[in-house]
Amino acid sequence: PAGPEEEIRELIPQMEMYCEKHGGEFLMYGLSEAQFALLDSWYPGRYQIEYDRDAADYIYESEKLCTLSGKKLHGKRNHINKFKATYEDWAYEPLEEDNLEECFQMALKWRNENGCEDDEEKNCEMCVTLNSLRLFRELHLRGGVLRVHGEIVAFTVGEPVSEDTFVVHIEKAFAEVPGAYTMINQQFVEHECKGYRYVNREDDAGEEGLRKAKLSYKPAMLLEKGIVTKVLEVSE
């Protein structure tokens, strides 16, 4: 649940009652340590949480994602420099009304090239991506696109989640354009995340390749999230 704390507190017992009425198990997904601490302060000992490493969000300092400074990110800077040297006509621009349809078509092409139709998980992910573009204005999202030879080769979509944190929901790039992922990552933060101390690039879903990629950017912290269940009452 989301909203004012007092309303959430009142809603929890109603959620429990709903689950009991319909024969379902009471579960809450994606709670952080701070959120569970608040829940436990309201209802001491009533709930328990099990954290899932695969669901942990990667939180980065926006300045470091923008500048890629330091020895640990030297390889990323090399990727950026090579990209700029290879594609001298590259360009970054914000995702707006006039390029939204073009970005949508790029996403469709990406889906076809990556076998999403034959992979249920990938297909579901692309449904979210395409719907985010369809409802881009209604959801008040922000985005950015990367062009090479005038064509969109990468794009990113996200939104602010607090005064100091911006979350990146979607990032897609053509694999045949080396460095496109690194470039859109850096450019998006530079242009769209100014004023935010942190960038949340979400979880890795337990995918080894994605985990390696996210760790390579040296996150400032991992935000653990877990599944909350009721503590079983043991009858004497």
Give short role names for the model-derived ranges.
Residues P1-A34, R147-A175:
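Conserved donor-binding loop and adjoining core beta-sheet/short helix segment
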Residues Y18-G23, E88, H191-Y198:
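Short, surface-exposed connector motifs at secondary-structure boundaries
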Residues L27-M28, E93, Y198-R201:
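Short catalytic-loop micro-motif centered on adjacent basic/acidic residues
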Residues A34-Y51, N78, A205-L222:
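Conserved active-site alpha-helix within GNAT-family acetyltransferase domains
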Residues P44-E117:
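Acyltransferase donor/substrate-recognition loop-hinge adjacent to the catalytic core
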Residues I49-Y58, A220-V234:
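Conserved catalytic-core motifs of GNAT/GCN5-like acyltransferases
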Residues D98, E102-E151:
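Short, conserved active-site entrance elements at the starts or edges of catalytic domains
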Residues L141-V231:
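Aromatic (often tryptophan-rich) hydrophobic motifs at membrane interfaces
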